[in-house]
Design a protein with these regions (language model features):
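Non-heme Fe(II)/2-oxoglutarate
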Residues: 2-88, 93-100, 213
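Catalytic core of non-heme Fe(II) oxygenases with the double-stranded beta-helix
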Residues: 79-84, 88-180, 185, 189-196, ...
Length: 222
């Protein structure tokens, strides 16, 4: 999708208990919260470890089967040629401000000419666990010709609180991030884990992106 996409924040949808129980159980037993925490303690680069799963082949891993379970919920258009996915792993007390600053997902992080930027058709987040804060925040802001969010300040914001097996789906051109505790009392530190799934009409250009079939080895899951 280009920056001329007419969809808005009103198209954001949240689905509870989205995956079949058996599939979600498989996912959290394969990749446990303890394993996520151990990798993070070793400074594993979660945000520079992304994967591409093309639409023209059958699923071969559990992660790809999860994506196929999400497909009928998303109902991507025929323009979507694949999915970029990764795990978002954040310590909820890393900062009281934004755990992940607001940003635009795009096909090329180095491209500054807005005319050439392609956004996912749909961006989405599958939450794996519950935490007291760390909400996904999606705003009504889109990109302008100066590569900045417009309007300058959001007119409307939607907050999605993490809950196991909850799935948030929103137009891929919208500005979004992850909120810290802000004004709220500090709670015991937890790791917030979510699977980000972007449905795109173009394969992103990130040099660190891998074939989706390499995920098991990348995460040392055997």
């Amino acid at each position: 999708m280009t920056h001329n996409d007419s969809r808005t924040l009103q198209d954001l949808a949240v689905y509870t208990d989205c995956l079949p129980d058996a599939r979600f159980s498989q996912l959290i037993h394969l990749f446990t919260l303890q394993h996520f925490a151990a990798l993070q303690a070793d400074r594993f680069p979660f945000y520079r470890t992304t994967f591409w799963y093309p639409s023209d082949r059958q699923p071969e891993t559990l992660f790809e089967r999860v994506i196929e379970d999400l497909r009928p919920v998303v109902r991507p258009s025929a323009e979507v040629v694949g999915v970029e996915w990764w795990f978002s792993v954040l310590n909820i007390n890393a900062t009281p401000q934004w755990l992940l600053p607001c940003h635009f997902d795009r096909n090329d992080l180095d491209e500054r000419d807005v005319r050439h930027i392609v956004f996912p058709e749909w961006a989405s987040v599958l939450f794996l666990n519950a935490v007291p804060y760390g909400e996904l925040v999606v705003t009504d802001q889109v990109i302008n010709n100066a590569d900045k969010p417009t309007p300058r300040e959001p007119g409307v914001m939607r907050f999605v609180h993490p809950s196991p097996n909850q799935y948030a789906l929103f137009p891929g051109q919208l500005y979004h991030g992850v909120l810290g505790r802000m004004w709220r009392p500090m709670q015991p530190n937890l790791v917030r884990v979510a699977m980000a799934v972007n449905w795109g009409a173009e394969k992103p250009k990130a040099g660190y992106m891998r074939d989706s079939r390499e995920a098991m080895a990348a995460f040392d899951l055997g």
